[in-house]
Amino acid sequence: MWNASDVNFSCYHESVLGYRYVAVSWGIVVAVTGTVGNVLTLLALAIQPKLRTRFNLLIANLTVADLLYCTLLQPFSVDTYLHLHWRTGATFCQIFGFLLFVSNSVSILTLCLIALGRYLLIAHPKLFPQVFSAKGIVLALVSTWVVAVASFAPLWPIYILVPVVCTCSFDRIRGQPYTTILMGIYFVVGLSSVGVFYCLIHQQVKRAAQAMNQYKLRQASIRSNHVAGAHEAVPGRFQELDSGLASGGPSEGISSEPVSAATTQTLEGDSSEVRDQSNSKAAKQMAEKNPPGVAAKARTTKGAQRAQDSPSEFGKVTRMCFAVFLCFTLSYIPFLLLNILDAKVQAPRVVHMLAANLTWLNGCINPVLYAAMNRQFRQAYGSLLRRGPQSFHRFH
C-alpha cells in the first residue's frame, strides 16, 4: 500500500532522480497544450453558430473539467516532480487532491451523459428531446459537479502527499472501504456503462443494416421480374447511418427508420434543437403509401438531401465521442491495474510514476481529437488562431 508522507511532503527517491525531468517535460506539455486547447474549445463553442447547441453543453462541461486540471492543478504537479517535494503546504495539498478527483469524476459523468445522448438519438429519438431539454441539460450539468463534490468531500481530512506518485491524493488505508467503493463506481461501473452504450449503438446500426440488405435483395428480385416501377427504392424507409465505431471509413449501417436532420446535428450542423420525431414517422408512412415515382421526385428537395447527409454526420460525431471515451479509458487502465496488482508497491517507483503520468493525457487530448475528427471545430480553431478577436465578429 502507498506510504503517506504527510510530515515533510517529500517524494524524494534515488531511483527517480533522472526520471523526474521526463515527468516535468511531459507535465509542461500537458499544461500548455491542455490550457490552450481547452480555451480554444470553449471559444469555438461560443463563436461558431453550428456548434452552439444544447447537447454541446456537455462538451463544454467536459472542457471545463479538463481546463480545471490543466490550468490550475497541473503546474503544481510539475513543480512537485521538479523538486520531489510538495512546497505549498498541507491545506493546499488537500485542495489539490479534492479538485483532482472532482475533475476526473465530472469527466466520467459527462462521458456517461454523452454516450447516453448518442444512444437515445439512434434508438429512442422521441425520448431524446425530453431527456435533453433545456431544463434537462442544465440539471444534468449541475448534477455532475454536485455528485462529484459530494462524493469526494468526505475524504477531506485524508488528502495527503502520496510519495510513490508524487501527487496529493487520498490516503488509501484510512479511506477504506469508502474509497474502494467510490473508485469502483466511477471507473468500473461508470466507464463500463459508457462502453455498453456505444456497443448498443453499434448493434442498433448493425441490425438495421441487415434489414436494409434484405430490402435490397427484395428490390433486386422485383427488378429481375421486370415489375413496373420497381427500379426505384422507396425513399424514407431506410437511410444509411454510420454508427461511428468502425476503425476505417463510415460503416454500412442502415437505419430502418428515418432520422431527421435536426436529430443528427446536435453536435455538428445547424443550431436548431431536436424536434418531435413523429414527423419522421409520418413521412415514412407517406413514403410507403405513395407510388415510387412520386416519392422519387420528392427526394430531390433540399430537405431530403439534408436528411440523407445527416446520418453520416451522426457517425462522425459518434466516432469522435467514442474516441474521447477510449483515450480517457486507455490513459487510466495502466494506473488502475498497477494499483490493483501491486497494492503493496513492490514494483519500481518509476513504474508507478509512469502509470500516473499517463493519466495526465486525458486533460489535453480532447481538443486534438475535436480538431482531427470534427470539421466545425477544426474551422473554428483555425479562425481563432488566424484572426484572433476578429473571429467573434465573423461568426455572429
Swiss-Prot record:
What is the source species? Answer: Bos taurus (Bovine)
Q: What is this protein called?
A: G-protein coupled receptor 84
InterPro entries attached to this UniProt entry:
GPCR_Rhodpsn, GPCR_Rhodpsn_7TM
Ordered alphabetically, the record's keywords are: Cell membrane, G-protein coupled receptor, Glycoprotein, Membrane, Phosphoprotein, Receptor, Transducer, Transmembrane, Transmembrane helix
Assembly mode: Interacts with ARRB2 and ARR3.
Task: Provide the record's note on post-translational modification.
Answer: Phosphorylated by a subset of GPR84-activating ligands. Constitutively phosphorylated at Ser-221 and Ser-224 in the absence of 2-HTP. By contrast, Thr-263 and Thr-264 are phosphorylated only following prior cell treatment with 2-HTP.
Is the keyword Transmembrane in the record? yes
Give residue ranges on the Cytoplasmic side.
48-57, 116-144, 202-320, 374-396
Question: Which one Pfam family would you cite for this protein?
Answer: 7tm_1
**GO CC terms in record:** plasma membrane
The protein's superkingdom reads Eukaryota
Tell me its family: Belongs to the G-protein coupled receptor 1 family.
Alphabetized GO MF terms? urotensin II receptor activity
Glycosylation site positions = N3, N8
Topology Extracellular: residue spans: 1-26, 79-94, 166-180, 342-352
